[in-house]
C-alpha cells in the first residue's frame, strides 16, 4: 500500500501544474486565431468606429445634415470649413455622410436581422423534419432565388411603396432564403450526430433538441454569414434609394445622396465621391470581418 501511494505521489509530482490563465477556452482559441489576421482586425476596428459614429452622428456632425444651407459656397469642394465640400443646395456633405451612416447601417443591420431570424427558423424546420416541410420551404426558397435580389426588392417596394421601412422589409425578404438554406444544411448534418440521438433517447422534445442542441451548432455559420450579408444589404438599400424607391430627400441616406448628386457629378464630382467612398469602405470592412470570423471560427476551411 505504501509503495502504491509512493508511486501515485511521484506521478502527481511529475505532472506539470496548469495555471488558470493557461487554460484555453474556445473564446481564447477564437481570439488567438482572429487577432493574427491583420486585415480582419483592421476591419473590426473600422466597423466599431462606424457603429460609434452612427450612434452619435447627430452630435458629432459639425452642421445640421438637413437644415443647414451655406448659399455662399454652393458646390464648393473640400475645405477647412467643409471637409467633404458642399452640395448644390449648400448642405455640408461631411455632416450628411456621418448621419447617413446611421441610416444606412441601421437599414442594413435590421434587414439582415429580420432575414436571419425568419430564415433560421425555416431552415431548422426544413432540416429537422424533412418530408413535406422540407419540400415546401425549399420550393419557396427556390422561387425567391429565381429572381435577382435587387429585382425582387424593387418588386416588393413597388407593392409596399417607397420609404426606408419598406426598403428594410424588401431587403429582408431576399435574405430569408439564403439563411434558410445555410441553416438547413447544418441541421441535416447535426441531426445525424450521436449526441442528438442520445438526447432523443432520453425523451428530449423536438423543441429542446432544436434549441439546445442543433441551433448552437449553427451559430458560428450564422454569425459569419450575417456579418457578410450586412454589406450586401447596405448596397441593396442604397441602390433602392438611388432609384428613388428608398429614403426620400432631404433624408441624408447614402443612396439618396447619390441620387441627388447625379445632376452635379460633372461640375462637382466630390458630391458623389464621398457617399460612394463611404459605401465602398463599409461594405469592404464587413466582408473582411466576415472572412476573418470564418477563418477564426473554423480554421479547417482556411486550410
Curated annotation (Swiss-Prot):
According to the entry, every stretch annotated as the ABC transmembrane type-1 domain falls at: 101-290
Q: Name one GO cellular component term.
A: plasma membrane
Q: What Gene3D superfamilies does UniProt report for this protein, alphabetically? A: MetI-like
Give the CDD domains listed for this entry: TM_PBP2
Q: What's a Gene Ontology MF term here?
A: dipeptide transmembrane transporter activity
Q: Which UniProt keywords apply?
A: Cell inner membrane, Cell membrane, Membrane, Transmembrane, Transmembrane helix, Transport
Its subcellular locations are:
Cell inner membrane
Q: What InterPro entries does the record tag this protein with?
A: BP-dependent_transpt_permease, MetI-like, MetI-like_sf, OppC_N
Topology relative to the membrane: Multi-pass membrane protein
Q: Which residues cross the membrane?
A: 40-60, 105-125, 144-164, 165-185, 222-242, 266-286
UniProt xrefs under PROSITE patterns: ABC_TM1
- Could you give the subunit structure recorded for this chain? The complex is composed of two ATP-binding proteins (GsiA), two transmembrane proteins (GsiC and GsiD) and a solute-binding protein (GsiB).
* UniProt similarity note: Belongs to the binding-protein-dependent transport system permease family.
Q: Which NCBIfam families match?
A: PRK15082.1
Q: What does this protein do?
A: Part of the ABC transporter complex GsiABCD involved in glutathione import. Probably responsible for the translocation of the substrate across the membrane.
Task: Tell me what this protein is called.
Answer: Glutathione transport system permease protein GsiD
Q: Which organism is it from?
A: Shigella dysenteriae serotype 1 (strain Sd197)
Amino acid at each position: 500500500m505504501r509503495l502504491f501511494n509512493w508511486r501515485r505521489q511521484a506521478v502527481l509530482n511529475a505532472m506539470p501544474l496548469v495555471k488558470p490563465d493557461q487554460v484555453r477556452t474556445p473564446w481564447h482559441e477564437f481570439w488567438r486565431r482572429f487577432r493574427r489576421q491583420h486585415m480582419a482586425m483592421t476591419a473590426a476596428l473600422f466597423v466599431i468606429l462606424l457603429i460609434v459614429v452612427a450612434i452619435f452622428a447627430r452630435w458629432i456632425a459639425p452642421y445640421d445634415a438637413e437644415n443647414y444651407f451655406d448659399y455662399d459656397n454652393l458646390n464648393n469642394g473640400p475645405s477647412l470649413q467643409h471637409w467633404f465640400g458642399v452640395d448644390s443646395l449648400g448642405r455640408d456633405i461631411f455632416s450628411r455622410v456621418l448621419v447617413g451612416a446611421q441610416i444606412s447601417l441601421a437599414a442594413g443591420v435590421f434587414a439582415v436581422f429580420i432575414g436571419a431570424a425568419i430564415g433560421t427558423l425555416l431552415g431548422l424546420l426544413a432540416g429537422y423534419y424533412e418530408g413535406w416541410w422540407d419540400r415546401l420551404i425549399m420550393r419557396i426558397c427556390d422561387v425567391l432565388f429565381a429572381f435577382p435580389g435587387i429585382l425582387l426588392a424593387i418588386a416588393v417596394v413597388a407593392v409596399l411603396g417607397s420609404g426606408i421601412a419598406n426598403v428594410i422589409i424588401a431587403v429582408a425578404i431576399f435574405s430569408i432564403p439564403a439563411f434558410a438554406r445555410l441553416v438547413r444544411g447544418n441541421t441535416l448534418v447535426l441531426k445525424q450526430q450521436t449526441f442528438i440521438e442520445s438526447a432523443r433517447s432520453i425523451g428530449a422534445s423536438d423543441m429542446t433538441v432544436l434549441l439546445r442542441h442543433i441551433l448552437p451548432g449553427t451559430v458560428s455559420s450564422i454569425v459569419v454569414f450575417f456579418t457578410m450579408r450586412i454589406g450586401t444589404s447596405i448596397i441593396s438599400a442604397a441602390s433602392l434609394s438611388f432609384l428613388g424607391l428608398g429614403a426620400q430627400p432631404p433624408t441624408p441616406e447614402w443612396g439618396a445622396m447619390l441620387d441627388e448628386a447625379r445632376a452635379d457629378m460633372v461640375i462637382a464630382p466630390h458630391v458623389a465621391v464621398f457617399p460612394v467612398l463611404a459605401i465602398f469602405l463599409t461594405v469592404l470592412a464587413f466582408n473582411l470581418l466576415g472572412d476573418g470570423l470564418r477563418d477564426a471560427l473554423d480554421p479547417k476551411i482556411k486550410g
